[in-house]
From Swiss-Prot:
The lineage of its organism: Bacteria, Bacillati, Bacillota, Bacilli, Bacillales. PROSITE patterns: SAM_MT_UBIE (PS51608), UBIE_1 (PS01183), UBIE_2 (PS01184). It catalyses: a 2-demethylmenaquinol + S-adenosyl-L-methionine = a menaquinol + S-adenosyl-L-homocysteine + H(+). InterPro entries: SAM-dependent_MTases_sf (IPR029063), UbiE/COQ5_MeTrFase (IPR004033), UbiE/COQ5_MeTrFase_CS (IPR023576). The gene is menG. HAMAP family: MenG_UbiE_methyltr. S-adenosyl-L-methionine binds at T60, D81, D106, A107. Keywords: Menaquinone biosynthesis, Methyltransferase, S-adenosyl-L-methionine, Transferase. This is Demethylmenaquinone methyltransferase. Pfam families: Ubie_methyltran. It is an enzyme of class 2 (transferase). Methyltransferase required for the conversion of demethylmenaquinol (DMKH2) to menaquinol (MKH2). Its EC number is 2.1.1.163.
Length: 241
């Protein structure tokens, strides 16, 4: 418990400090591939007009904005993040979008009723949560029966060549970017550690099952450096079938 609290405070400090630089940093570190990956994921999701979506760990609201376009004017998207500074950047970007609400909150204790959303997403945020399973269980709780959960996150490469490149990148390139954008050694070290230590796609798939999701689809991107996990909450009408 104390370890989780320490991680929570560390991550909060990091994102409070890098909020103004986060979008640029994300573009540089991923070589703008995160935009390509998200487009693929949105295409797979096939979000329905008029639906309600929750974007957990929404950060500066990039995925929140994509969801708002997908649900249309009759839909509603809520973005949640625990960094007030990240949300401030997000609010500036979403000021003209009436179907978006940004909320300050904790991914491990979501301030929403059970069965509230048709879609729940989390993009490049799960690795920053102290307890992955707790966050996934909360996402399951607030998802409507039959609803879809989607996680887009860094992963551990599976192809040998990408494994070597990935390792070299994190040892030599990431520290340079970190020093350029982060205010302290602690901040850029966290950016490295949280990505490098995140579970591989099969381990994460197991956590999705443990959280209660079914019919999980896993898709790798760019040699496995990122992965999508898509699952569903059991439809109550199907119980007992």
């Amino acid at each position: 418990m104390a370890e989780n609290q320490a991680k929570k405070e560390q991550v909060h400090t990091v994102f409070q400090n890098i909020s103004q630089k986060y979008d640029r940093l994300n573009n540089i570190i991923s070589f703008e591939q995160h935009k390509v990956w998200r487009k693929h994921v949105m295409s797979t999701m096939n979000v329905q007009k008029g639906s309600k979506a929750l974007d957990v760990c929404c950060g500066t609201a990039d995925w929140t904005i994509a969801l708002s376009e997908a649900v249309g004017s009759k839909g509603q998207v809520t973005g949640l993040d625990f960094s007030e500074n990240m949300l401030e950047v997000g609010k500036q970007k979403t000021a003209s979008l009436e179907n978006i609400q940004l909320v300050h909150g904790d991914a491990m204790n979501l301030p929403f009723d059970d069965n509230s959303f048709d879609y729940v997403t989390i993009g490049f945020g799960l690795r920053n949560v102290p307890d992955y399973l707790s966050a996934l269980k909360e996402m399951h709780r607030v998802l409507k029966p039959g609803g879809m959960v989607v996680c887009l996150e860094t992963s551990q490469p599976t192809l040998p060549l990408f494994k070597q490149i990935y390792s070299l990148y994190f040892k030599f390139v990431m520290p340079i970017f970190g020093k350029m954008f982060a205010k302290s050694k602690e901040e850029y070290e966290w950016l490295q550690q949280s990505t490098f230590n995140f579970p591989d796609k099969q381990t994460l798939k197991g956590l999705f099952f443990e959280a209660g999701f079914n019919d999980i689809i896993v898709r790798s991107f760019t040699g496995g450096v990122a992965a999508m996990h898509l699952g569903y909450k059991e439809n109550s009408s199907s119980k007992g079938d």
